[in-house]
């Protein structure tokens, strides 16, 4: 298969086709994917069947992985794969297998509460509700948002920083520790 790229929107997003992420990729394909991500900010790969180790292996092509925060009980979601966060509303044997899957996570930016946020996040969606049931995931181009600001607002924002409180998670639950 030949790798192909299709832009999704003027502001951001590209669809990458002709690649099987469950298999090791040629360095040239990884470079095309990374350059596409840097230019388009969001990259979508449809119909990928990945095991947890395959997802981790693909992710490591782009740098060291940042550990996600612990689950509400202070533990990794998957002891055998602490690099992964499980977002799910599925309950097995009376215990949730993940968190934030019942609509608790409102509009947010992943891990902006850490001093040096990760350069990217990967989402491997296995089962998603239809859009009319709240199954949408949205992305925003903050570079374009900044560029569209009037000059006086850009000047007012220059040199400013924000502090994101890490005491609660995206669902508003107090973090352990």
Language model features with spans:
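Non-heme Fe(II) oxygenase catalytic core, chiefly the N-lobe of the double-stranded beta-helix
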Residues: 2-177
């Amino acid at each position: 298969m030949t790798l192909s790229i299709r832009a999704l929107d003027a502001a951001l997003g590209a669809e990458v086709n002709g690649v099987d992420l469950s298999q090791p990729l040629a360095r040239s394909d990884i470079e095309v994917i990374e350059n596409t991500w840097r230019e388009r900010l969001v990259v979508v790969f449809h119909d990928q069947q990945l095991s947890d180790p395959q997802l981790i292996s693909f992710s490591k092509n782009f740098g060291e992985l940042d550990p996600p925060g612990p689950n509400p009980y202070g533990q990794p979601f998957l002891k055998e794969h602490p690099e992964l966060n499980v977002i799910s509303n599925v309950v097995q044997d009376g215990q949730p297998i993940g968190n934030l899957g019942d609509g608790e996570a409102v509009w947010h930016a992943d891990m902006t509460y850490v001093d040096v946020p990760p350069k990217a996040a990967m989402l491997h969606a296995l089962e998603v509700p239809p859009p009319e049931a709240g199954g949408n995931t949205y992305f925003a181009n903050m570079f374009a948002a900044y560029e569209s600001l009037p000059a006086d607002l850009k000047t007012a924002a220059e040199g400013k920083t924000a502090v994101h409180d890490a005491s609660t998670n995206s669902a508003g639950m107090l973090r352990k520790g």
